[in-house]
Amino acid sequence: MPVSRNTLQPVPDKWNAFYCRLSRDDDNEGDSNSILHQKQILERYARDHGIKQYRYYVDDGYSGTNFNRPGFKEMLADIEGGHVKAVIVKDMSRFGRNYLEVGMYTEIRFPELDVRFVAINDGVDSEDQSGNEFTPFRNIINETYP
């Protein structure tokens, strides 16, 4: 296991990616979508599911229709590098609001790379296909209702 140069602590080879995003428009809705609120939901999920190794990727002030976001790109680089075992978000709209692009990642790219995808509040978990039949419809709604 590699060691972090900054802390001399072991760095896990694989971790869970906790992704948070807040656009300027979402900010008008108050604390319900705030980055802090998203992190609280993700941390509760981690506790409830015994997840110990995770890393946050955050894009504050970026639209979900734009996938050229710094935190998102950093997460993708870590996924492509084989370091991420799961991407976990508060809900599908936090991941993105472009139906085709979201579907490309969640339905094609992540499965190709053996990366699990979880959207907590939407009940989406790529390991449990029984609850995922409405995921494409959620993506369409998220795209049309920013």
Predicted regions and their residues:
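Short, structured surface patches at the beginning of a domain
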Residues: M1-P146
